[in-house]
Amino acid sequence: VVHDNCSLQFKDDLVIAADDVRLQRANQDLWRIDASGQLWLEGKKVNTNASTTQTLKDYQHGLRTQSHAVVGLVADAMQMAATAVDKVVQALGGENPQLQASVDQAIGTLKQHVDTIVVQKGGDIRINGSKINNADGKFEQEFEQAVEQSMMKLTGALMMSMGQSMSEGDGDFETKMAAFGEKMDKFGNDLEAEMKEKGDGLEARGEQICTQLRELDVIEQQIQAQVPAMKAYDLIDTSKEGIKAPKLGQAEEQGQG
């Protein structure tokens, strides 16, 4: 999560609560840091000097802030995707309730997968890293299947819309085909412009999160130097790429291929 050379490496579950931040495995605390900077490792209180306590306080505050930012970014990205798909459905004939229902179901499946990773309850956030990194890769497979299902439904709808356009109205096949192509080109250009504007905004937010994660990584390394046992729970790695969504252009190329 979320940008080039900027990622949170979740193997366990991060819990952002009102009073503290916790890293859990099988619902058992690996570490816990409260708002004052007090650290517990596997349930045992760790005494630290004033400097380390302040560093821990800054760390939990940074994790809290960035987790909320990432969750907001993911939610807005999902909304953008849903909006784009809805516009495609409308362009292909919004009077088709069966198509709308099937696409809504596919988008709903994607949202359900995301909701199993990020759980919000009141003001608390739980990021289930254990579900992302499960041994059999089941989550990744199911997520990819849901994406493929959405694209298959839209591709099928496009073919049906094309066939309907060819069978209606006057004129020969070539004329109808050209008119349909012009209609789809205009729609595609308009949609691309709208999604690019929104996508650029999301990317800018991702850049900001990435910058702040790099700063937080420095704090994390300071903690690991001061409390060596924390090295086992490294959350931030600025040397690796995070999970990235496909760019709009790539999706269009796949659709045109």
Describe the predicted segments one by one:
Residues V1-L110:
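N-terminal Sec/ER secretory leader and immediately downstream segment
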Residues V1-R32, M166, D170-F173, M177, ...:
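Charged/polar interaction segments and conserved charged motifs
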Residues H68-V71, M78, A82, D115-V118, ...:
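Residue-level signal for secondary-structure boundary elements
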Residues A82, P97-K121, T155-L158, Q224-K231, ...:
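Short, surface-exposed, charge-dense and proline/glycine-enriched linear segments
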Residues G93-G94, E168, D217, D234:
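Short, flexible coil/linker elements and helix-boundary hinge sites characteristic
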Residues D104-E207:
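Extended amphipathic alpha-helical interaction segments
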Residues M177-G257:
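A cross-kingdom marker for long, charged
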